[in-house]
Amino acid sequence: MVEQNKALVRRWFDEVLTRGEVRLVDELFAPNYVLHDPGFAYEVRGRDGIKRFAATFRAASPDVRFAVEDQIAEGDVVVTRWTARGTHRGAFLEIPPTDNQRTVTGIEFDRVVDGKIDEAWVSYHLFTEGTLDPERVKRAFNMIHDAFPDLRVAQADKVAEKDKVAFRWMMSGTHEGEFMGVAPTGTRVAVMGMDIVRVGDGEILDYWGEFDVMGMLRQLGITPPLERADN
């Protein structure tokens, strides 16, 4: 069953998002589907909502191609790590078109019920930094802890398969130090993030992580919220 669920979710990336076959949404998704995308101020709901979401994404980058880098599945949940590449020709989120080639990385948790994608959570990075060595990872975590000294992370979901484990989590804290050039505001923020780790011999061998940087900046008053994606 998990392999069937993986194949179902892969069709979303390969056939709908990459090829633009939006008509397949009715076949792949449950009628009451919900997408929790932190890039939008509201949840995307229903088949019509996800059709508009896919159309918006492809309008921003008509030549977009999604590559499924990895999938992990357990029970009714499929976790997909993906990379999207395309030319930025239309506005997407708060970013106006640049006509530049853009690469976006992301992780998505999809829950499958009765052979349909019923609910999803996605986190992505619009400004991909590539591979970080251990020292840069330490600096990144130190920056976050310095900016949010009371930081708390709560696990929301966990999926494991073979030597990989995926986590979905919520992070909260008070902005008391500089963060990405933003002076302390005293604002309490809460954002979603996702990690995938590969383990061996009691150690973490590889780590892939995404969290809602845009949502955090929005809560700090840096960017305006977007309009509903399902209106």
Residue ranges and their predicted role:
Residues 1-231:
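C-terminal and inter-domain tail/linker signature
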